[in-house]
Design a protein with these regions (language model features):
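A residue-level signal for conserved active-site and pocket-lining positions in enzyme catalytic cores
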Residues: 35, 154, 286
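A short SAM/SAH-binding and catalytic strip from SAM-dependent methyltransferases
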Residues: 149-172, 211-216, 220, 228-235
Length: 350
């Protein structure tokens, strides 16, 4: 408890300093970046085990590779094909979680992978990954950022949803950017909107109040990836929607979600630093951004259809009943099958 309190105090001091530098107002994307990624005090710096199947493990959320090892084994089919097209023996994973997906891909691809690079900002997660992947240690390398030149197949599972977003809020038909302030009278962080010229990429029908996210960092990431991807392709798996669903008039409260001990809420201004903050992905916007930066959209579908296309059912023929049951969670509509999507981008010649 003392460690948690000191970390919370450290994060609070950092937020207060940032608020002072910003004349008392902090854009939400900056707030989200500090809360999640500030060295030593952010969520991913101090949460020793954010990913796991059960709250009793101290985890906050579960990802597909932990639901079933057949996620990575099936994804390996598509990764292998992309590696052959790109004539590369390198896989680059961005944000590798606890290392489960890397283990599954390395195990399935075997000698076809000569180098497996991981871009990971969390020291805790690096330690978890190193322990899980020690059997593949000669191949595995950790990086602090994307390489200047990439000749590889890139994989990002639940990465885009954790990138900081701006919040756009339409009130009385006027658009504002939502930011964070500190209220000394209540001793709490609170919302404050400021007028902005920024707009969502599509017109929002109706004149009702409306809140949505603007994926500024994910778009910047796509532009950087486009600049540096010399040869190869990239697979991004995440929960989200195409633009017409993401900006649906009835989705007027946005998609921002927090996760703590496998429970979700929509208030990032409470339990700051103790819970994950995410936003669903506008896959249309991400694909368009990648295309405008010079990449080609090679495929987009639901996770269920993607895994079925890669031969999941055939791969499960010799699996145990329990393994089949777990794998079905990856493709069932009410589990991960439809909400999660897969986007593949790359160079046109791949």
């Amino acid at each position: 408890m003392e460690k948690q309190a000191s970390l919370a105090t450290g994060l609070h001091r950092l937020l207060q300093a940032s608020l002072q530098a910003g004349e008392g107002w902090l854009p939400f994307d900056r707030f989200m970046a500090l809360v999640l990624y500030a060295p030593g005090v952010g969520y991913y710096s101090q949460r020793s085990q954010p990913i796991g199947r059960m709250p009793s493990q101290g985890s906050d959320f579960v990802t597909a590779p932990l639901v079933s090892p057949w996620f990575g084994r099936t994804l390996a089919v598509a990764v292998q094909e992309a590696m052959q097209h790109a004539q590369t023996t390198t896989v680059l994973e961005f944000g590798a979680g606890d290392g489960s997906l890397a283990f599954q891909l390395l195990d399935a691809l075997g000698d076809q992978v000569e180098r497996y690079a991981i871009v990971e900002v969390s020291a805790h997660l690096r330690e978890m990954q190193a322990k899980r992947l020690q059997g593949f240690s000669p191949k595995v390398q950790w990086l602090d950022a994307l390489p200047e030149a990439i000749e590889a197949v890139v994989v990002g599972n639940e990465v885009l949803d954790a990138m900081p977003v701006k919040l756009l809020h339409r009130v009385n038909q006027t658009w504002h950017e939502r930011g964070v302030i500190w209220e000394p009278n209540t001793g709490r962080y609170a919302w404050q909107d400021r007028p902005t010229e920024a707009r969502p990429p599509v017109a929002i029908e109706g004149d009702h109040d409306y809140l949505c996210e603007s994926p500024v960092q994910a778009n910047a990431f796509m532009r950087t990836l486009a600049e540096r991807l010399r040869r190869g392709a990239a697979f991004f798996i995440d929960y989200g929607f195409p633009a017409h669903e993401f900006y649906h008039p009835q989705r007027h409260m946005g998609t921002l979600m927090c996760h703590h001990h496998h429970r979700s809420d929509a208030d990032p201004l409470t339990d700051i630093g103790a819970k994950d903050i995410t936003a669903h992905v506008d896959f249309t916007g991400i694909a368009l951004c990648a295309q405008e930066a010079g990449l080609t959209c090679l495929g987009y579908t639901s996770q269920a259809q993607f895994l079925l296309n890669c031969g999941l059912l055939r791969l499960l023929e010799d699996a145990s009943p329990l393994e089949r049951q777990q794998a079905m969670m990856l493709i069932q509509d009410h589990e991960m099958g439809e909400l999660f999507k897969v986007l593949e981008i790359g160079r046109a010649h791949v």
